[in-house]
Regions:
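N-terminal capping segments
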Residues: 1-64
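Non-catalytic ligand/cofactor/substrate-binding and regulatory segments of enzyme domains
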Residues: 1-15, 112-127
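...with weaker cross-activation on analogous glycine-rich loops/strands in unrelated enzymes
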Residues: 51-118
């Protein structure tokens, strides 16, 4: 049942464009977690920045990376090789982290200048 909810979420979000602060890699992941587990994690982030520079500034003021925020709200750290459908995969890129959703052998992420990108897990670090 949860696999079905995950795939429904991805299909619903696939065509939506990237927008800093409301539809970027981190809000995509937080909204996903909220919709699957009936939480409200995205509200602390959504709409707080509108540019990449704004995201970096917000990150500094927020005081937690995405991974730390998820762990402080009940998540746990695992190796990417242990990820299963619905797990969150995070890439550290410079001064911030990029969140993605594991779909089994595939991974979904929201990248700038694109809508949802789906790629193979083994290509995960090249996103």
């Amino acid at each position: 049942m949860i696999d079905n909810k995950i795939h429904q979420y991805i299909e619903k979000e696939r065509s939506k464009p990237f927008v800093w602060g409301s539809r970027d890699c981190n809000t995509f992941v937080l909204n996903f977690i909220d919709s699957i587990y009936n939480l409200d994690l995205e509200k602390k982030v959504k709409g707080k920045y509108k540019t990449e520079f704004g995201a970096i500034k917000f990150q500094k003021n927020f005081g937690q990376y995405l991974s730390e925020y998820l762990i402080s709200n009940g998540g746990k750290k695992i190796l990417p090789t242990q990820a299963t459908i619905g797990d969150i995969l995070i890439i550290k890129k410079g001064v911030y982290e990029l969140g993605h959703i594991c779909l089994g052998a595939l991974v979904a992420g929201c990248l700038e200048h694109e809508s949802i990108v789906i790629g193979r897990v083994q290509d995960f670090n090249s996103f």
